[in-house]
Amino acid sequence: MTVFMEDLTQQVVSSASPYVWSLVLAFATVLISIALLYLARFSAKLEVKDLADLRSMFDRFPAWGKRASWAQQNSFEAFSLHAPAALLAAIAALNGQTLPTIASLAAFAYPALRLAYICAYVFNVPLARSLCWLLGLLCSGVLYGVGLSALLA
């Protein structure tokens, strides 16, 4: 009986792993965007007086640093949309629902698209940035749709 339960537990947990990894990797892209922002802050030569008004230092950022700041802000917004979608899909998988392959693809594509989005933003490639943003949003939408339909079935 114990071997059966361990095998069953391993199967259930592994079915949720694409969505959990999506969540972990998506958070890693948020951390990358924060690191780029701090790199921009150091290139703007942070001074003691800036501690009283950090936003005024933004004017001294190089152009790429300003874009890194905007990418970082968007990373928090995008993560707050994606995290519930990934959790919803993970919960559906943990409940024994078999999710379609497109859900796993969307889960793994999302962090890659967010990383590409950040790079496109910092390097000022607006068309690629917009395309990555849209595709990332669609990936989150797929996870919401698949997760909800699996849980409501």
Question: Which residues fall in each region the model found?
Answer:
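Short alpha-helical packing/oligomerization segments
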Residues: P84-A112
